[in-house]
């Protein structure tokens, strides 16, 4: 996770700072190392076959348990570090009045984007059925609870991207230029899963182009919310919602919807226009 790199740098360069959340940082770096080992093992270890002859890795559930257990310890150490240390290193959760409004705005924009996409594909009636299904809302609120048990994954990105790298790039390339460049960095960071998870390698380049559209446009919105609230938990929660609401509102109620997608070059222009109109407009607002 990018956050682990930030923490390692702070542990080395600011080890004399009494406000450094040392225990919290050390734990997160160690957790990241464990997840790296598990990831490598899942790639190198031979895959098993389930009863349906589908390939699966025995390391996948192990990684889930590590993330869940790690998230529990994460919250304990974060709270134990104290307000002063959290405030000194951007871990504080303040300005919740405006923060909640930003999160609700994102949910509204996300659903608007979903409705437009369904309308363009002629599936608006199916989306209406999904929204009217009580199971959808049960799963939705279950997903919200799961945030607390999977937080390390989203914190791991956003503490590195939004808390550390965004201000650094904005200082060098301007408020807007820094955010756009960060979106490009964020997109490239997703390159392996673009080729081997979201799609198959033959569609990898189209998936990467689509990732640039998503990361730049969504990154603009997330950057705005962070500058507006100075609350790192806002982009963390938005990142979580963005990754998980598709599972709910696609009607599949399964993360499998993210895997082996069909992404074609002809889809990119429409996605670019729609994402910039829905998320990118905030670049013209003052934070």
Predicted regions and their residues:
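Alpha-helical transmembrane segments in multi-pass membrane proteins
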Residues: 1-12, 16-78, 101-104, 127-129, ...
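Membrane-interface capping segments at transmembrane-helix boundaries
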Residues: 11-18, 79-87, 280-287
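Membrane-interface helix-boundary motifs at transmembrane edges
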Residues: 12-23, 86-94, 166-174, 226-230
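Central hydrophobic cores of alpha-helical transmembrane segments
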Residues: 23-34, 178-185, 234-244
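Juxtamembrane "helix-exit" motif on the non-cytosolic side of transmembrane helices
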Residues: 38-52, 116-124, 192-199, 249-256
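Membrane-interface helix/loop boundary segments of multi-pass membrane proteins
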Residues: 108, 155-183, 197, 227-231
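C-terminal membrane module of polytopic membrane proteins
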Residues: 201-208, 232, 238-287
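Hydrophobic alpha-helical segments embedded in the membrane of multi-pass proteins
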Residues: 208-224
């Amino acid at each position: 996770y990018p956050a682990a790199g930030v923490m390692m740098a702070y542990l080395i360069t600011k080890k004399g700072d009494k406000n450094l959340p040392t225990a919290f940082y050390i734990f997160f770096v160690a957790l990241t190392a464990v997840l790296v080992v598990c990831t490598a093992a899942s790639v190198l270890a031979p895959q098993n076959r389930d009863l349906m002859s589908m390939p699966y890795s025995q390391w996948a559930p192990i990684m889930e348990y590590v993330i869940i257990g790690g998230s529990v310890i994460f919250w304990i150490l974060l709270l134990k570090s104290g307000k002063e240390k959290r405030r000194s290193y951007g871990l504080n959760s303040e300005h919740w009045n405006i923060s909640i409004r930003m999160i609700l705005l994102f949910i509204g924009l996300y659903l608007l984007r979903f409705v437009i996409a369904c309308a363009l594909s002629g599936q608006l009636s199916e989306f209406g059925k999904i929204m009217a299904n009580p199971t959808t809302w049960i799963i939705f609120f279950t997903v919200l609870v799961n945030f607390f048990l999977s937080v390390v994954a989203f914190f791991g990105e956003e503490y590195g991207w939004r808390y550390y790298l965004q201000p650094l790039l904005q200082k060098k390339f301007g408020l807007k230029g820094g955010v756009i460049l960060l979106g490009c960095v964020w997109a490239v960071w997703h390159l392996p899963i673009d080729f081997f998870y979201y799609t198959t390698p033959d569609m990898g380049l189209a998936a990467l182009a689509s990732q640039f559209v998503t990361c730049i446009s969504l990154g603009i919105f997330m950057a705005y919310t962070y500058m507006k609230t100075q609350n790192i938990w806002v982009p963390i929660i938005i990142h979580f919602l963005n990754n998980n609401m598709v599972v709910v509102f696609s009607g599949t109620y399964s993360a499998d919807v993210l895997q082996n997608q069909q992404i074609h070059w002809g889809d990119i222009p429409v996605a670019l226009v729609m994402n910039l109109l829905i998320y990118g407009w905030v670049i013209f607002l003052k934070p």
